[in-house]
């Protein structure tokens, strides 16, 4: 362990020079590290069911049911695009060996925020990531991708790593890049899914791939091929993420 910040420990592999993040809550002998007592035994590896060698991802296709989300001013509702991309992402991640849990798998379900929290609690002991898929809307002029990450990672940590990897992948598709957002509310993370996941020690973020109400951005989401491209970009970023963190 070479550093601990915001509850996350960065663990270096001296043989390769690379490192990974792990929740400091999973480490023993953290006090010895912090005190710099080199005479003590090294920190022992984490012992928890959460770290089991299986990439476990909860995918949340945002909105659903009566909550359609944003709209392009015509027939394209956000809840549809979110689900279609999520279904492809599930397929791609499972092909890579991940275990995937879907918050919803139909257009009719998923309008309640509490459903997200219930799924998180059900899989809290094994989930390595809560990944929420959304598409933005504003005033028809705004465009581009942004990621809503957990505030604990503002200065570095798992969701910031994944957020940057996502933006890098989206940029390859030609999507304008906006920013990584760390928004704080009165009770922690401003965004519900980030806040609820943080309470369960699950890294979580929301991908806002582009603006569904912007004419230029719509070209990135108006076909099945586009949904597959977005899902592949997300898969690439998530698989990279899992090379940087323990799971």
Model regions and ranges:
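Boundary regions of SH3-family modules and the immediately adjacent low-complexity/disordered segments
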Residues: 13-47
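Sec-exported extracytoplasmic/periplasmic mature domains
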Residues: 32, 87-99, 121-125, 135, ...
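Conserved beta-strand/loop element in small beta-rich adapter and peptidoglycan-binding domains
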Residues: 1-5
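Short aromatic-glycine-enriched beta-strand elements
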Residues: 6-10
């Amino acid at each position: 362990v070479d550093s601990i910040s915001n509850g996350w420990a960065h663990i270096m592999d001296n043989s390769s020079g690379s490192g990974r993040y792990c929740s400091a809550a999973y480490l023993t002998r953290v006090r010895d590290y912090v005190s710099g007592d080199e005479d003590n035994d090294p920190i022992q590896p984490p012992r928890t069911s959460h770290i089991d060698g299986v990439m476990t991802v909860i995918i949340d296709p945002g909105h659903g049911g009566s909550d359609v989300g944003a709209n392009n001013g015509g027939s394209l509702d956000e809840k549809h695009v979110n689900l279609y991309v999520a279904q492809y992402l599930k397929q791609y991640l499972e092909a890579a060996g991940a275990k995937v849990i879907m918050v919803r798998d139909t257009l009719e379900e998923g309008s309640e925020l509490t459903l997200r929290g219930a799924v998180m609690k059900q899989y809290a002991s094994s989930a390595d990531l809560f990944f929420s898929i959304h598409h933005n809307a504003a005033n028809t002029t705004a465009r581009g991708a942004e990621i809503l990450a957990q505030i604990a990672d503002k200065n570095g940590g798992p969701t910031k790593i994944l957020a940057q990897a996502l933006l890098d992948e989206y940029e390859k598709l030609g999507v304008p890049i906006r920013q990584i957002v760390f928004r704080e509310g009165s009770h922690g993370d401003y965004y519900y899914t980030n806040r609820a996941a943080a309470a369960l020690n699950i890294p979580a973020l929301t991908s806002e791939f582009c603006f569904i109400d912007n004419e230029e951005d719509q070209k990135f989401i108006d076909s099945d091929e586009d949904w597959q491209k977005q899902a592949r970009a997300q898969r690439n970023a998530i698989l990279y993420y899992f090379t940087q963190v323990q799971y």
